């Protein structure tokens, strides 16, 4: 996938964007991440009402963040907003096969346009002003551009909770790559994580040369102390269970990866011979 590979022209554009960005944030008002909280509920096919446990979790975040602007983005609200502000992105949004892809894609669009913090609906808030609470004291006066917590190294950047300053080049890059990444990857789970989800974002992260703009929240601080999972994973399919077991068993996964490489090499040689007959 292109967003996992180095591209000299893309790298130059990122550097130009960062030069412009850094010239704009000298204003003291830009030192803080906007106090805007985004959550998303999309059920475009079944038109389901939001689950009670998600509503309870959302209420906990609202009650602890009365000084934040809060928006629950629904399918219809997103379409109306995109029509006004990002009409060119509406076909990309509508062409996704799954709602989870739409949710992931909109996380990046909303954080780019508004800035603030995005939180999945299955996360219950346990602290006030999460943006400040995630940061050490020495980073609270001049907050980092982007706050993330990483998944497994080399595989994903978690997207369940993220914070960012408005119009940041990192999320501009992410949004710009969504259309090209929207492909079918043969499995439901792989399609979601590679086309718009955590693995997609990790590819963008690898492309982005300015790693000093990120702050990584330790999972030991985040979970249990600042937020609590109330049971989500509503998007997981049968293949998710298989992939999870595969990843947890290192010996089995290494063997399967090796076997897959051998099979692909054999297929490649067969096709190459057939081509020159």
State each model region's role.
Residues 1-103, 121-277:
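Glycosyltransferase-associated regions of secretory-pathway enzymes
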Residues 104-116:
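Small-residue hinge/turn detector
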């Amino acid at each position: 996938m292109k967003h996992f590979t180095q591209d000299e022209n893309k790298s130059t554009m990122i550097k130009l964007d960062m030069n412009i960005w850094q010239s704009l944030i000298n204003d003291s008002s830009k030192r803080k991440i906007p106090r805007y909280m985004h959550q998303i509920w999309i059920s475009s096919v079944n038109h389901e009402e939001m689950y009670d446990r998600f509503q309870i979790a959302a209420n906990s975040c609202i009650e602890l963040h009365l000084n934040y602007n809060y928006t629950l983005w629904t399918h219809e609200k997103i379409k109306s907003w995109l029509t006004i502000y990002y009409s060119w992105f509406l076909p990309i949004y509508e062409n996704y096969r799954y709602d989870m892809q739409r949710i992931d894609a909109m996380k990046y669009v909303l954080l780019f346009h508004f800035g603030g913090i995005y939180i999945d609906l299955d996360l219950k808030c346990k602290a006030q002003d999460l943006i400040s609470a995630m940061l050490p004291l020495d980073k609270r006066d001049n907050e980092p551009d982007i706050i993330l917590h990483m998944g497994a190294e080399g595989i994903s950047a978690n997207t369940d909770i993220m914070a960012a300053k408005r119009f940041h080049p990192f999320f501009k890059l992410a949004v710009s790559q969504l259309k090209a990444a929207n492909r079918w990857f043969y499995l439901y789970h792989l399609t979601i994580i590679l086309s718009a989800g955590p693995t997609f974002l990790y590819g963008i992260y690898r492309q982005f040369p300015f790693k000093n703009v990120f702050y990584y929240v330790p999972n030991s601080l985040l979970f249990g102390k600042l937020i609590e999972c109330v049971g989500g994973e509503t998007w997981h399919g049968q293949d998710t269970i298989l992939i999870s077991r595969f990843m947890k068993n290192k010996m089995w996964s290494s063997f399967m990866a090796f076997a897959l490489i051998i099979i692909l090499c054999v297929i490649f040689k067969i096709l190459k011979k057939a081509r020159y007959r």
